[in-house]
Regions:
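Carbohydrate-binding surfaces of carbohydrate-active enzymes
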Residues: 2, 6-230
Length: 233
């Protein structure tokens, strides 16, 4: 007498930004929203080769056991889908989010946000032709902009490395766009401080922490406030 346990028998899907994450030592591995794990029934409920192999094995061992044939869902072929609307994030930022002002950067949790993106904004005066910036303790992936021009992208362990930028004006706008790529949902890191997203310490210009930040929460739960009539860059 024995039994088998299939994990999983039926694949599934997480929607939106609820993808989750696996903890592996000091590294977090974001998961995709497809939750399949080579299941006998795939994400859309269709049988796979594994399903038919199990069916064959069961029929050989238990020939009298009735087995129904699974339904196969119809799907359309993949085609190119043209974009009808597009707009730059900076162009429509004020229509989709209102800034929260603080001296130092706040985490996503401190701002009452669970998932999505968070844009940090401040300004810096030009003291030299080149400035060294560092984002200290950020999660999970960042893009840094000077006057809305992309300068660098950093991910996980890269965050904290020096970013050298040219400041073209006397006063320059600094934007740091942070993406929350998923929190762990089991294991030793479940309640760890590393699961707090956004900038958890601060941003340094040379040896000093930058202050006077505006934070724009971007959960992206709705597109109703996006103004597509504005500029695309």
């Amino acid at each position: 007498l024995g039994s088998i346990n299939l994990y999983m028998f039926h694949g599934g899907t997480n929607f939106g930004f609820m993808n989750g994450c696996s903890a592996r030592g000091t590294i977090d591995l974001p998961q995709i929203t497809s939750y399949d794990y080579d299941a006998p029934l795939d994400e859309q409920g269709n049988p796979t080769e594994k399903y038919f192999a199990l069916q064959k094995m069961l029929h050989e061992e238990y020939p009298a056991l009735p087995q129904a044939e699974p339904l196969v869902k119809e799907s359309f072929a993949q085609t190119a889908i043209p974009l009808t609307n597009k707009v730059s994030l900076f162009a429509t930022l004020e229509t989709i989010s209102q800034p929260v002002v603080s001296v130092y950067p706040q985490t996503m949790e401190q701002l009452g946000q669970n998932t999505g993106y968070l844009l940090y904004r401040t300004s810096i005066e030009k003291d030299a032709a080149e400035e060294k910036l560092r984002v200290i303790d950020g999660r999970d992936r960042l893009q840094l902009f000077v006057n809305q021009v992309h300068q660098a992208t950093q991910y996980q362990t890269e965050i904290g490395e020096d970013i050298y930028v040219t400041l073209p004006q006397e006063n320059n706008q600094i934007d740091v766009l942070i993406e929350n790529m998923g929190r762990v949902n089991y294991g030793h890191k479940l309640f760890a401080d590393t699961q707090k997203k956004g900038i958890r310490t601060g941003v340094m210009a040379d040896l000093h922490f930058m202050t006077q930040w505006q934070q724009y929460c971007l959960p992206m739960t709705s597109c109703e406030q996006v103004d597509y009539s504005r500029e695309w860059q």
